[in-house]
Amino acid sequence: MAVFDTPEEAFGVLRPVCVQLTKTQTVENVEHLQTQLQAISDTALQELQQYILFPLRFALKTPGPKRERLVQSVVECLTFVLSSTCVREQELLQELFSELSACLYSPSSQKPAALSEELKLAVIQGLSTLMHSAYRDIILTFYEPSILPRLGFAVSLLLGLAEQEKSKQIKIAALQCLQVLLLQCDCQDHPRPLDELEQQQLGDLLASFLPGISTALTRIITGDFKQGHSIVVSSLKVFYKTVGFIMADEQLTRIPKAQAKPVVEHRVAALMIHREADWVKSTGDKLAIFIKKIIDCVSVHPHWKVRLELVEFVEILLLKCTQSLVESTGPLLKVLVGLVNDESPEVQARCSTVLRRLADQKVVVGSRALADILSESLHSLATSLPRLMNTQDDQGKFSTLSLLLGYLKLLGPKVHVILNSVAHVQRLSRALIQVLELEVTDVKMVEERRWNSDNLSASAEVSAARPWSRVQRRYFRCFTDERVFLLLRKICQLLGYYGDLYLLVDHFMELYHTSVVYRKQAAMILNELVVGAAGLDVEDIHNKCPSMGPEELREIVKSILEEYTSQENWYLITCFEAEEGEEVMMKQQGFQAVTSGVHTCQVVSFPALSKPSPTICSMNSNIWQICIQLEGIGQFAYALGKDFRLLLMSALYPILEKAGDPTLLISQVATSTMVDICHACGYNSVQHLINQNSDYLVNGISLNLRHLALHPHAPKVLEAMLRNADASLLPLVADVVQDVLATLDQFYDKRAASFVSVLHALLAALAHWFPDSGSTGQLQQRSLEEEGRQLPAAGEASTTAEDIEQFVLSYLQEKDVAEGNVSDLEAEEEVQSAPPKVDENDTLPDVEPPLPTHIQIAKDVMERCIHLSADKNLKIRLKVLDVLGLCVEVLQTHKNQLLPLAHRAWPSLVHRLTSDDPLAVLRAFKVLQTLGSRCGDFLRSRFCKDVLPKLTSSLITQAPISARAGPVYSHTLAFKLQLAVLQGLGPLCENLDLGEGDLNKVADACVIYLSTKQPVKLQEAARSVFLHLMRVDPDSTWLLLHELYCPVQQFTAPHPSLHPVQLQGATQPQNPYATNVCHLLLQLQ
């Protein structure tokens, strides 16, 4: 469409349209005009502005009822014209303002007209566009006293729409239009900024509307949350911009005491406000009520954008109205301080920025500095804090502690001065100690034991997470919300950062010593104080550098560390199962859990576990105290960084003691603490940490083993070291191992459990450090031999006499071994092998070469285990059997040492297998499997004579029971024993290369379990037995399976000269063995 740039061309196009609209006011004529206007340039429209507006205004002013659609079209067309032009005449601006405002009012009913939402929205947008189109100085002349009635009329209409309208779009548009009418909008279309005089005149004018605006907006803001966050945000913005402008201290200081009389009608003059001192005080008091209502409601609003706008609300009022709104300063500061720890990062960041700005500008409220008000507020809060922590719910505690944290952040370095007051420190510490009281009645903590040593080993690589943030989850008596605990940690860190650390540490150390009731809480606080003093992860809005040097901090940490690891605070009784010697030692030394009788741990009967008792509570308390102290050591390392290496000699040994503690929680926390130390001190892993400090650790263990009655935890340290070190540690610990074995020989009746755990850790480490490199080759060789057995015997004709001779000699040797003639084994090997040729100058050694260190250790340990395998304590027997299995794994490459020891261990092992507790039978059977895979020929005759008959008899006896049993049977010990035997028999038959008779016994015992009446897991285990039997004797296995179930009635011979084969097996598909037999036969093919 062509664009008409000149007024003449535009007039020629628009004249007939305007004339037609003036004559006939219809929607079509208005839309026709708007269509033509889109083809006119802005310059031409500006020249023809009043000509174009005339028919539109005429249509609005025509008396009589009008269709809403027509009025809406006229307002939209008028808005289009105003958006493209400027209003340059004051009279035109006032008239258009009145005409648009009248569209929203019904003169007949004397209240806002009941219009469609579309028309209301169009009129609101038209008013906003009109005010933006006013030309420069014209807008200022509009705001004169004579306009007060019309302006007040528009303001009341817009407030009514914002409060009562249901449409969210209209509500927001009305609030934005109100902001424009008050000259407080944020857009760039407004004229130049107002000078001081203009601001004062406009403030005097708008002050008349302040009561109505503040009242209506407060109702909107504190309304239902369901109205939507955007409405609350817009209402807050209008409120603080209006109040911040009218009540601005900068304006009010220039207001003269006497009011100049305006040249206006008496009716209008009565509406004028003189903002003198009394009015300011009265209005400030009334606004304080509204502001408190708004703060109480909005500070807990669920939407973060509303809380973010509240921060802007507080900032504007605190920066502009500190003198006029003195009564509101406290609540405003309180909400700002509370929101500094908001869950929304956007709110937190903005709040911190505002706090920093307030601190930098040194805002004065009334005649007092902001810091004085904050100090007074902190004092008041500290006074009521113990009561609030005792009476509030979790949300209340969170809000109160957020407030406390905010005060500390805002006061910053001045906290140091405040904490010089003994009363302040006592109130704060009493509240913190009270709220941090732990719940220690949980029986589960005492029951959770570290039954095996696997929990001792930490991960090889150090986690990348911040160490001190991984605090063990704990439960408190006063709250359950985890956010409250996080706030308490931040508060303690800020106290350590800004306060006098010497004073605070002395105070909480005194509480630590005063009573066992305070000890755990005081330790938690001390840990966080040290982290805060280091300035790590502390949000400092004052940019204060830590005043404490690393040497001073290290000395403080050293003193706390010494207190934590002292005898009376480190060696607390945490379980019922304290060994006798340790218990006696504790009583002799006086190292009870606490000095008072409440937490003295006594050995009680197990029925006491049925309900929480004071004894259980005391042990739980001890567990938590040790865990908190361990976490504290990790936090100290985090605070000191690599400087903590200077304290490792006094810290690492006690931590390793707790890493081997039988209480699961303590063991886990100790291991986690070692990971924290690795973070701080630059070690790659816990293994690296222990290797680098192993010399003094081993020295300490060696010394303490010689005085075991005074140092009963020395074996635990060695156990933890072995779990977390590598083979480079072996030369250092070789002598210590001999000390352990010698001490075990001396105290086996009292301390066998501790030492057997150490031996288990030692052998597990040796098996890991020195794996059998030849095992893979042996497996490959075995598979090749199996393939060779399955090949056709085509090459057997070429067998030589030498081969036959070698076969006979090997057979005789294996027969001797199977019959137990072990002592002659070495002599036979010397006879059969020709002596090597040596040089005449060389001399033959008179003695055998020394064994490798790990082989000698394994040999010595296995000798002790043979004696301990008959111990009366079941737990010790189980652990000894585990150690025996590990010894066999380590010694498998040295048969000359392994076989004699296996010979000596065999009688005890048979007794465990046949006449012991079912748990011991299970464990002994695992040892038997290990022996079978490492020394098969040696074990063959013994196994067949001493063990196999009882195993097969047991399987046959239990088969009917398991076939009839229900699903609960799979949880019984009898089932687990059946399953273990079935799973292990197959490999044993193959490894021991049993003869046909013994294989038949195994097959007869296991064939019952191929029935589908047996539990599924037992069927699977039985199938695994027959899969192994197929490898040893496939023909017999094939025949046995077909006797159970025959898929075909008659086998056709592969050659005509052979007769067909008829088997006796059942052929019915309902046969209970059919499924498993078919599965096995398929595998055999």
From Swiss-Prot:
Gene3D superfamilies: Leucine-rich Repeat Variant. The modification Phosphoserine is found at S459, S823. Phosphorylated at Ser-823 by CK2 following growth factor deprivation, leading to its subsequent ubiquitination by the SCF(FBXO9) complex. Phosphorylation by CK2 only takes place when TELO2 is bound to mTORC1, not mTORC2; leading to selective ubiquitination of mTORC1-associated protein. Keywords: Cytoplasm, Phosphoprotein, Ubl conjugation. It is found in: Cytoplasm. Residues 777-799, 822-847 are annotated as: Disordered. It comes from the Eukaryota. GO terms for cellular component: cytoplasm; TORC1 complex; TORC2 complex; TTT Hsp90 cochaperone complex. One of its GO terms (biological process) is regulation of TOR signaling. It holds the Pfam family TPR_TTI1_2nd. The keyword Cytoplasm applies. InterPro entries: ARM-like (IPR011989), ARM-type_fold (IPR016024), TELO2-interacting_protein_1 (IPR052587), Tti1 (IPR016441), TTI1_rpt (IPR049362). SUPFAM superfamilies: ARM repeat. Its main location: cytoplasm. Component of the TTT complex composed of TELO2, TTI1 and TTI2. Interacts with ATM, ATR, MTOR, PRKDC, SMG1, TELO2, TRRAP and TTI2. Component of the mTORC1 and mTORC2 complexes. Interacts with WAC; WAC positively regulates MTOR activity by promoting the assembly of the TTT complex and the RUVBL complex composed of RUVBL1 and RUVBL2 into the TTT-RUVBL complex which leads to the dimerization of the mTORC1 complex and its subsequent activation. PANTHER family: TEL2 INTERACTING PROTEIN 1 TTI1 FAMILY MEMBER, TELO2-INTERACTING PROTEIN 1 HOMOLOG. Belongs to the tti1 family. Regulator of the DNA damage response (DDR). Part of the TTT complex that is required to stabilize protein levels of the phosphatidylinositol 3-kinase-related protein kinase (PIKK) family proteins. The TTT complex is involved in the cellular resistance to DNA damage stresses, like ionizing radiation (IR), ultraviolet (UV) and mitomycin C (MMC). Together with the TTT complex and HSP90 may participate in the proper folding of newly synthesized PIKKs. This is TELO2-interacting protein 1 homolog. It comes from Mus musculus.
